[in-house]
Amino acid sequence: AQFLVSAIIPALWQIVIVVSTLLVLAANQRDHGLVRWLAPSPGVALCRTLLPYVPLFWLQGVAFLVWFYSGLQWPMQGNLWVLFAAQVPTILECMAMGSVFFFLTLDPARAMSFAGAFTAPSFAFMGITFPVSDMSPLAQAWRSLLPISHYIEAQVSQVSYGASALTTLMHLTPLLGYLLPALLCLLLARRHLNSAI
């Protein structure tokens, strides 16, 4: 249970974040319309819409870690606070990907299909049950695109090895690459807004 559940729950958590982001964006589009919702600044409007959900997703992440390592008293070699900190950029990148999927089409059903295809292999590609070095190049590339793959490396380094905070958080540096999807999301939102005006 400790080996599998500690990876399955974060994989499901990633899916929850991406899908919830899509649903929030779809609800705002439906209830307010693009112009009223995003004008005059799509970036500010998206931050105003999505940032209130970051603490909610973070509390979910905190809850499963506390459940694992305090409630079930699974062995923990490191510090939970390092993992709490590692969850914040993971959440932001999952939300960025959910936003990109939504603004690619403005169609919630199609965006949900993209999100499902993207996140479905999360558990298999994490490198927990199958070594990353033995994965095909395609699987390794897909794994590198999944935010939770980088978080799980941080979790393993802290839980199993008690690594320093800096070493653990260095596993998250690839998440800086998700600034590109965030930028793409803003460009797509602005393009849809300009088309709607």
What role is predicted for each listed range?
Residues 55, 66-67, 74-197:
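Membrane-spanning alpha-helical segments of multipass transporters and channels
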Residues 1-62, 68, 78-79, 167-168, ...:
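Transmembrane helix-boundary elements of multi-pass transport/secretion proteins
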